[in-house]
């Protein structure tokens, strides 16, 4: 009836599930309230070479960012990192209690192949510039 100040999501760690929870509960959050999402940083898992948790935590952070990117007028996003923990994201609500979030649409992103290829292309470009001199 009056809304809540804080929502903490530490669920099954499936990106779509986390996004669904944020979308559902956002309207119940008071203005200046926050949704916290646990386990969004893969570094501790990557250091342990735990591929499954690394992927899951990265995808969870991606889903939190997608929610934010589709709702920038309603909220802000802060991400907290600690190399000994799995990170925490905070969605801070700027809009009034009862405000429904926008539907989350996929935001364009570059191809992961280009992310891997880019550093090599930069090196080649520098090499060609040096050869040209």
Task: Label every PLM stretch briefly.
Residues 1-7:
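A short acidic, Gly/Pro-enriched loop at the edge of an enzyme's catalytic core
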Residues 10:
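Active-site residues of response regulator receiver
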Residues 15-132:
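C-terminal substrate-binding/active-site "lid" region of AdoMet-derived donor-dependent transferases
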